[in-house]
């Protein structure tokens, strides 16, 4: 009989990119509600290792956030 205290090792599920797939949202600088999910509470762009966004989509996302900031749709700094 196996150890009573032995447990199965925990395997973290690999996150998938939220922007890939058939019904994934498009990255658009006018969609400030979507972009705010990828900006921290201090106004910084959240890295892809935390959000699990692919490298290509992270570049698109950063470009869209910067464009929205320039046009005044998103704040540069949140106090």
Swiss-Prot record:
Query: Any idea which GO molecular function terms this record carries?
Result: small ribosomal subunit rRNA binding; structural constituent of ribosome
Q: Do you know which Pfam families this protein is assigned to? A: Ribosomal_S18 (PF01084)
Q: Which GO terms are recorded in the biological process aspect for this UniProt protein?
A: translation
Q: Which InterPro entries does the entry mention? A: Ribosomal_bS18, Ribosomal_bS18_CS, Ribosomal_bS18_sf
This protein's UniProt keywords: Ribonucleoprotein, Ribosomal protein, RNA-binding, rRNA-binding
What SUPFAM superfamilies does the entry give? Ribosomal protein S18
Q: Identify one Gene Ontology CC term for this UniProt entry.
A: cytosolic small ribosomal subunit
The entry's family comment says: Belongs to the bacterial ribosomal protein bS18 family.
Question: Assembly and partners?
Answer: Part of the 30S ribosomal subunit. Forms a tight heterodimer with protein bS6.
Which PANTHER family has this protein been placed in?
30S RIBOSOMAL PROTEIN S18, SMALL RIBOSOMAL SUBUNIT PROTEIN BS18M
| Record function comment | Binds as a heterodimer with protein bS6 to the central domain of the 16S rRNA, where it helps stabilize the platform of the 30S subunit.
What's this protein's name? Answer: Small ribosomal subunit protein bS18
| Protein's organism | Afipia carboxidovorans (strain ATCC 49405 / DSM 1227 / KCTC 32145 / OM5)
């Amino acid at each position: 009989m196996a150890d009573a205290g032995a447990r199965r090792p925990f395997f973290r599920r690999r996150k998938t990119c939220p922007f890939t797939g058939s019904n994934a949202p498009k990255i658009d600088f006018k969609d400030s509600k979507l972009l705010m999910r990828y900006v921290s509470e201090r106004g910084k762009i959240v890295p892809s290792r935390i959000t699990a966004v692919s490298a290509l989509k992270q570049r698109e996302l950063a470009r869209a956030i910067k464009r929205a900031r320039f046009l005044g749709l998103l704040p540069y700094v949140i106090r």
